[in-house]
Amino acid sequence: MKKTLNDKAYDFIVHKLSSGEIKPGQKLSEPSLAKACGISRTPMREAVRRLIEEGVLYQIVKSGTYVTGFGAKEVSDAYEIRSVIESAMLVEALEKLTRKDFAILQDTCDRMHAAIEAMRKAKMDIMTGKPENDFLKADILFHLTLLRASGNSLAEKIIVNAYRRNQFFGTHSHQRTLEHVALAWKFHCEILKACRAKNAPAAVKWLQDHIARSKHDALLPISRVSSF
């Protein structure tokens, strides 16, 4: 499916946020963004509106549009919402997962592993660039596949918003060392293994342990900064 100009504008801002080029608290200029993206202001305005609805941006009357600032509480809240909703939806999804779903889940685990191997081959201390991008895409697809299998579209929307926040403001707080990404991959593999066995308690435990560890790793750099 061909992307609309609205989607192009949205993806453009998302990339700027994810790369850290646009930072929390920064004021945005729609005309400048539209020019840099090579589109008119209308689709850029729609993209900004969409990100405001997702809580990533906010507007101040007669002042402008700003990137939401995220501290420890906001990061913690996003992970806690994920843990509660994803756990409940995982139980719902367990009896509904299809062969296609399992194929997607396995593929995401394989892609995460391939990204880790690319990291090893490049002798990276911290996963960055294409390996990181591939790893994160596979990570979120794994979780979204489980959510969609539950059939609860509202839960999916809430979690996507939480993921967006973690993606924009957690990507650069995480130190994606080999240990970090290898453990995340292991969590996904164990969740998949429990799902195949239709073992709900085990699947939920692995999921909650995974989210708890991700929350810990995301908050650690914030706590270090605040301690100075």
Predicted regions and their residues:
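Short linear motifs at protein or domain termini
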Residues: 1-96, 219-228
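Conserved amphipathic alpha-helical segments that form helical-bundle/coiled-coil interaction surfaces
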Residues: 73, 78, 99-171, 184-197, ...
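Helix-loop junctions at the membrane-solvent interface of multi-pass transporters
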Residues: 93, 150, 173-174, 222
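Solvent-exposed loop and edge beta-strand segments that line ligand/cofactor-binding
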Residues: 176-180
